Amino acid sequence: MIKVINILSDTNIGGAGRLLVNYLRNFDRSKIEGKVILPKDSQLKPYIEAEGYEVIETEHGRDKSFDMKAMREIQAILKREKPDIVHTHSAFSGKLAAFLCGVPVRFYTRHSAFPQPKKLTTFPGKQLNGLINSTLATDIVAVAEAAKDNLTETGVPEKKITVIINGSEEVRRTTPDEQKALRSSLGIAEGDFVCGISARLEDYKGHSYLLESASEVLRTHPDTVFLIVGGGSQEEALKRQACELGIEKKVIFTGFVHDVAPYYNIIDLNLNCSWGTETSCLALSEGMSIGLPAIATTYGGNPYMITEGVNGYLVPEKDAHAMAEAILKVMDDREDFEKLKIGARKMYEEKFTAAVMTRQLEKLYEEAVNRRKKK
């Protein structure tokens, strides 16, 4: 039995947290046992506990990658728990604590991809960053080739990195009556075509460009609704933008929702407008699980997930006109739309299930532990 402690510093539910819950749900409990360290009052806690895992809370380090007090708390926990593996997710405090405690196997997952500052891609910053990461982590997981590229360009040795593409659980299907009721409650007419996006409302997710695209689409296709699922710091600004564009009656903001499944079930076309931090997008794979084709930007790991004309289309990032044209192309060619739906489901089954992802990580865990035992 391998004892694993996962560490996150997030208090909200982002991609890293959702990914961890998928791992926990799919681990082979005859091989893997573990606990999760979170900052106090994290929204992730009930979801992790629902999977049967204990959550250990720290008083410090809320939404901070590094916090000295949090690091000391984590050190005390690790000394008590004595795990075989510590696996950190955007939590430098945990990474450093695991090293200082002498935990034999220290995993770190890179969940994002974004332009790196010059000081980290040139001498001496590149060499120093590579040395720090190689010392603190024995094994590194990148959730997309784009994330791996981010790491190698900042000095992290390629041999340390394994790419495991994000997988997701199959979205729960709702009944036609449930779908009709939700559409009605949101004011969506029976014949409306629903374009949807599920993402935190942050600048780098590209919602402002989506609203510009929506304005263009609605000029010729007024029976279209844009469903924006999620909450975030840009919510009020985006609502103002929708009003300024005169499309507020055709744009629905749900705010943060605990269960996105009912919303996926009323979406016709899945959208991803990211221009920063995107790797392998869970919202895309979740949508594919119920046959939702997608229009996505070419940023980060999106090109690995979307194959042109098979399960969707790709457009340049920050290009509202290109996004609008792609949406219209799908809406106006229903035969192609039906083919894309079939392609989306097929691709999910072949590449993007949570079970496939988890088996890959379990194998890495076993190999890392066995490697350490031989030393």
PLM region spans:
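Membrane-interface segments of envelope glycosyltransferases acting on lipid-linked substrates or membrane lipids
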Residues: 1-375
